[in-house]
Every structure is written in C-alpha cells, then in structure tokens.
C-alpha cells in the first residue's frame, strides 16, 4: 500500500512540474516576435526603426534587434515582456 501511495504522489508531482514547464515555454514564445520588414535596411538607428514598425502593427516592444537580411529588407527580433 505504501508503494502505491508513493507512486501516485510522485506521478501527481511530476505532472505538475511538467505542466509548469510547458506554461513557461508558451509564455516565452509570446514574449519574442520576429518579422521581416521590406522597407529597407537597418541603417544607423535600426532598433528604433524596428520599434516603430512593430508599434504600427502590434504594440511597442521593450527591446529590439535589427538585422540586415538584404539591401531591401531587414529582420526585426523584438521582445515584448
């Protein structure tokens, strides 16, 4: 009887831990967003340009990183939380 109780408690504990890890991973995915903008390269002020572009579509990000992909486009990686 002791072994069965221990097994059930252990199973419930592991289930709770795994569900919490999945929630944290899902929340992290919502915090980061990447998008390609075809309005030219990053230039000298790429971070602010990315923030303005994301603000027009979603909301204002906390931090952005601008990467030149081509002469005519840039990739913006932004963090929202």
Swiss-Prot record:
GO terms for cellular component: extracellular region. The keyword Secreted applies. Keywords: Disulfide bond, Secreted, Self-incompatibility, Signal. Its main location: secreted. The keyword Signal applies. Pfam families: SCRL. Disulfide bonds join 31-81, 42-66, 50-76, 64-78. GO terms for biological process: rejection of self pollen; signal transduction. Expressed in microspores and in young and mature anthers. It is found in: Secreted. Residues 1-26 form the signal peptide. Involved in self-incompatibility. Belongs to the DEFL family. The two genes are located within a perfect direct repeat and probably exhibit identical expression patterns. This is Defensin-like protein b.
């Amino acid at each position: 009887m002791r072994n069965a109780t221990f097994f059930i408690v252990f199973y419930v504990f592991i289930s709770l831990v795994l569900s919490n890890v999945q929630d944290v991973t899902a929340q992290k995915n919502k915090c980061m967003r990447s998008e390609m903008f075809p309005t030219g390269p990053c230039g000298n002020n790429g971070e602010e340009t990315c923030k303005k572009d994301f603000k027009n579509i979603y909301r204002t990000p906390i931090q952005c990183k601008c990467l030149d992909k081509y002469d005519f486009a840039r990739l913006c990686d932004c963090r929202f939380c």
